[in-house]
């Protein structure tokens, strides 16, 4: 297969389809989502058979259990896909919304209209459910999409693509609105991320090595995040009860997510009251504690151990594991400075009863999501009321934070006049 020619053809068809889907009615888009949901319910057996072949190959390659689990399309996973499609169908359609209309002295009205981005390339790894999640959000937001999943899920994704195409056709929409790259050749990714003539934005969903490669090689703009080095700062005016709840949930609710706390900062004045019970709780749950000298002294006095001495690298590390870095700081100034120096601009939280300090933290911490008296685990499109998300961005341009339907659109200016000419 000539990869360059193949990807150029995929891009050309996506661009053509993007013009049709951009003007599609809400009813047609919702009908397509419902048709895909019914197709998955109808053909669940065939989907599971295709997925079983992917899973068997993954096991033959010796891939670990966690990878195989992400790859597997269980009955529960298929049910979640169907529910997700129907949920997206219920979301308000952002396309065509008008906002900020105002009259100018010249007599014209100036406002903004929400429009699709165009063609979105999604690059992801071993989760076939992303095929449906991404297709649904791109479709509802009026975008064409090119999906490039991991090679290990190729049969699963191809089977899902067939059902998506059937659903689009049933609703009278172009089947090229959603295309799955049907080759495992890595050169396809290289071509996709440089096709500026056909692709408007890339959304990568994967590990750090994938994101770093795309940062270095992509010519198409990206909506992405590289790391989730999230902090909780416990202020010396915090409620100890709230601090224990927030810090426990932020770390131990799930270890492998990008919105999990990786560094705990505690104000010196409240450290004994907070770290003693927290340290015992973390050790009971099997969390390794990497601590600075001050935190070590407090925790050892409380009988908490074993402890590991933290290095500078620990403050810069996204563990995605039951490991937590802990540092005692002099106060909010030092906490904000540490977060802005070592964080990844993803999600950070303060626990405090002091309103002024809370507002200062919200203003000065340079992250996509900043929280007061709440777990970092709330940084999620569903929890934020977006209905669903295609990913989380810690960039500063375009979308920032959880990216839902609106994040897959842009605003253009519209002018309404009555024959006026500029004087």
Curated annotation (Swiss-Prot):
Coiled-coil annotation: which residues?
A: none
Q: Name one GO molecular function term.
A: glutamate-5-semialdehyde dehydrogenase activity
Question: What species does this protein belong to?
Answer: Burkholderia thailandensis (strain ATCC 700388 / DSM 13276 / CCUG 48851 / CIP 106301 / E264)
SUPFAM superfamilies hit by this protein: ALDH-like
Q: Which GO terms describe its cellular component?
A: cytoplasm
Q: Which reaction does it catalyse?
A: L-glutamate 5-semialdehyde + phosphate + NADP(+) = L-glutamyl 5-phosphate + NADPH + H(+)
Q: What is its EC number?
A: 1.2.1.41
Protein name, UniProt field: Gamma-glutamyl phosphate reductase
Q: Which family does it belong to?
A: Belongs to the gamma-glutamyl phosphate reductase family.
Which keywords does this Swiss-Prot/TrEMBL entry list? Amino-acid biosynthesis, Cytoplasm, NADP, Oxidoreductase, Proline biosynthesis
- Where found? Cytoplasm
PANTHER family given in the database record:
DELTA-1-PYRROLINE-5-CARBOXYLATE SYNTHASE, GLUTAMATE SEMIALDEHYDE DEHYDROGENASE
What is the enzyme's main class? oxidoreductase
């Amino acid at each position: 297969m000539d990869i360059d020619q193949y990807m150029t053809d995929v891009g050309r068809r996506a661009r053509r389809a993007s013009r049709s889907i951009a003007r599609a009615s809400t009813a047609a888009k919702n009908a397509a989502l419902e048709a895909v949901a019914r197709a998955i319910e109808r053909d669940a057996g065939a989907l599971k058979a295709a997925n079983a072949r992917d899973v068997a190959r993954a096991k033959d390659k010796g891939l670990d259990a966690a990878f195989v689990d992400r790859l597997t399309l269980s009955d529960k996973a298929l049910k979640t896909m169907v529910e997700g499609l129907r949920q997206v169908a219920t979301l308000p359609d952002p396309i065509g919304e008008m906002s900020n209309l105002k009259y100018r002295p010249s007599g014209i009205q100036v406002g903004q209209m929400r429009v699709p981005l165009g063609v979105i390339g999604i690059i992801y790894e071993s989760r076939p459910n992303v095929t449906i999640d991404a297709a649904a959000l791109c479709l509802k937001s009026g975008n064409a999409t090119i999906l490039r999943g991991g090679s290990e899920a190729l049969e699963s994704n191809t089977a899902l693509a067939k059902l998506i195409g059937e659903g689009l056709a049933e609703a009278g929409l172009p089947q090229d609105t959603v295309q799955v790259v049907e080759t495992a050749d890595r050169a396809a990714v290289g071509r996709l991320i440089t096709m500026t003539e056909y692709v408007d934005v890339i959304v990568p969903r994967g590990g750090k090595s994938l994101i770093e490669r795309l940062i270095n090689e992509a010519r198409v703009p990206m909506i992405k995040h590289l790391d989730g080095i999230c902090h909780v700062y416990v202020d010396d005016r915090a409620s100890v009860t709230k601090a224990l709840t927030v810090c426990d949930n932020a770390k131990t609710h799930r270890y492998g997510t990008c919105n999990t706390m990786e560094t705990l900062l505690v104000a010196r004045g409240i450290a004994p009251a907070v770290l003693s019970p927290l340290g015992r709780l973390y050790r009971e749950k099997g969390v390794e504690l990497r601590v600075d000298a001050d935190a070590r002294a407090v925790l050892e006095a409380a009988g908490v151990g074993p402890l590991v001495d933290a290095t500078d690298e620990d403050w810069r590390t996204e563990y995605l594991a039951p490991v937590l870095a802990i540092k005692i700081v002099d106060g909010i100034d030092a906490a904000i400075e540490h977060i802005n120096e070592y964080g990844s601009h993803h999600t950070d939280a303060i626990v405090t009863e002091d309103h002024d300090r809370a507002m200062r933290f919200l203003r000065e911490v340079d992250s996509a999501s900043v929280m007061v008296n709440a777990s970092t685990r709330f940084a999620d499109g569903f929890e934020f009321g977006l209905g669903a998300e295609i990913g989380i961005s810690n960039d500063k341009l375009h979308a920032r934070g959880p990216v839902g339907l609106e994040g897959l659109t842009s605003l253009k200016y519209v002018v309404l006049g009555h024959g006026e000419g500029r004087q």
